[in-house]
Design a protein with these regions (language model features):
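RNase H-like, metal-dependent nuclease domains and their acidic two-metal-ion catalytic environment used
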Residues: 1-107, 113-122, 126, 130, ...
């Protein structure tokens, strides 16, 4: 099980949004065991929060650090931050404020992801949109009963239109006058939770990985 804290840093229009998502694989069904199939990952949203518009970045960072500290009590936690507009200073402030792992994501309009450093991803927005759309369509996401702002999240999701242009560019547009901060934070958490990891190595693959690590 892993925990991703998706953070969409607010600027002039939208407030900062924080979404804590837990990613796990359910137990295998007898049929999956028989055919050595891996159950798909599922996502459980535990916390949704908006930091009021106009809050200075120092206080935004403090709040993210508090939420990250609480999330670390659930399991291995990683802050996944949209660094497209805020730049490196916010990332550096967060690194000084929390012991939680951090990944900075810079959205691009390209087709291939690059990773200029261990904690920075330059990622096509289509990858994040597709990850969320796939999880939603497969109904592999749920909200814990006491998760705050889940109705606001559902409203944002219902007003968004996920589409792909003829040139392969992904877009997601909300209804006029609506915010997209919660959906953006959710996209970051789900995208990170869907990325390949050690739980994708099974049987001989896992044994081979373990031998290589010795």
């Amino acid at each position: 099980m892993s925990v991703a804290i998706g953070c969409d840093i607010g600027q002039q229009v939208d407030p900062t949004a924080i979404v804590v998502g837990e990613t796990y694989r359910p137990e295998q069904t007898p049929e999956e065991l028989k055919h050595r199939q891996r159950p798909d990952r599922r996502h459980r949203v535990r916390w949704i929060e908006r930091v009021p518009l106009g809050t200075d970045y120092g206080r935004v960072v403090e709040r993210i650090a508090v939420v990250a500290g609480q999330a670390q009590m659930i399991g291995s936690a990683t802050i996944v931050l949209d660094a497209t507009g805020v730049g490196r200073p916010i990332v550096d402030m967060l690194k000084r404020s929390t012991s939680c792992s951090l990944r900075a994501v810079v959205f691009t309009s390209g087709q291939h992801e690059t990773q200029p450093s261990y904690d920075v991803f330059r990622t096509p927005k289509v990858d994040l949109v597709t990850s969320l759309e796939t999880v939603l369509q497969a109904r592999r996401i749920e909200f814990v009963p006491d998760c705050p702002l889940q109705e606001d999240m559902r409203a944002e999701l219902s007003s968004f239109d996920f589409s792909m242009s003829d040139r392969g560019h992904a877009t997601f547009d909300g209804a006029s006058g609506t915010h997209d901060d919660l959906v953006s934070a959710l996209m970051l958490a789900v995208w990170f939770g869907e990325r390949p990891g050690l739980d994708d190595l099974w049987g001989a693959e896992l044994a081979e990985y373990g031998a290589a690590a010795l």
